């Protein structure tokens, strides 16, 4: 066998193993990269946010949950993840903007029901779900503490409450440490 023939065989052996190696690297490294992104997002503090419904009761925290109504997640042993907090209150209770920004979306959609998203900047956004009545429209500028909606029970909801999310760089983070007030716990 010539040196060129041996080199070709070596390349062929490597090229057959390369997809397997790439797959193994992706499977091993992707969870580490995602975990690093979540840690980085949690580390970044957007500043104190206004409690969006000051007289509501916290009924479901952020994170892994056994509630099957929540989206599936392989990251949780319970296989379900709640990407925000639920604040229960009376129907048509006021909902205030947690931060100043632009209303990116205000519409009806699936599990969130009637919802809106306010973006403070390209990295920070807040989501308000299960609304009864939005009081601002897509494109409107809002200031923190401004009345923006009335609480409802639209979408995939078990009763009147606000589903509140904070996303940093597109990733959900626990809103509780970022809120400037205290909440009643149910």
Question: What do the predicted segments below correspond to?
Answer:
Residues 38-114, 144, 173:
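Surface-exposed, glycine-biased beta-strand/turn segments
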Residues 30, 128, 148:
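Short alpha-helical segments in extracytoplasmic peptidoglycan/chitin-binding modules
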Residues 60, 89, 105, 130-133, ...:
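A residue-level detector for short acidic-glycine micro-motifs
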Residues 1-46, 186:
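N-terminal secretion targeting segments of exported proteins
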Residues 58, 80-83, 114-120, 140-186:
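Conserved, short, structured surface segments that act as functional micro-motifs
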Residues 63, 92, 133-136, 156, ...:
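Disulfide-stabilized cysteine-rich extracellular repeat microdomains
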Residues 90-92, 123, 131, 146:
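A generic structural motif
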């Amino acid at each position: 066998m010539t040196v060129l023939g041996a080199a070709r065989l070596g390349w062929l052996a490597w090229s057959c193993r390369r997809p397997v190696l790439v797959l193994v690297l992706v499977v091993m490294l992707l969870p580490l990269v995602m975990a690093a992104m979540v840690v980085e997002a949690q580390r970044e503090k957007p500043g104190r946010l206004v409690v969006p419904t000051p007289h509501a009761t916290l009924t479901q925290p952020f994170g892994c949950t056994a509630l099957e109504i929540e989206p599936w997640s392989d990251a949780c042993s319970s296989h379900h993840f709640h990407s925000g907090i639920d604040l229960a209150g009376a129907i048509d209770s006021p909902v205030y903007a947690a931060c100043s920004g632009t209303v990116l979306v205000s519409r009806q959609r699936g599990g969130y029901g009637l919802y809106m998203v306010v973006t403070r900047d390209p990295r920070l956004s807040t989501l308000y779900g299960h609304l009864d009545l939005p009081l601002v429209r897509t494109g409107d500028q809002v200031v923190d503490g401004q009345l923006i909606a009335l609480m409802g029970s639209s979408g995939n909801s078990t009763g009147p409450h606000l589903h509140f999310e904070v996303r940093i760089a597109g990733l959900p983070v626990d809103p509780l440490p970022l809120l400037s007030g205290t909440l009643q716990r149910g």
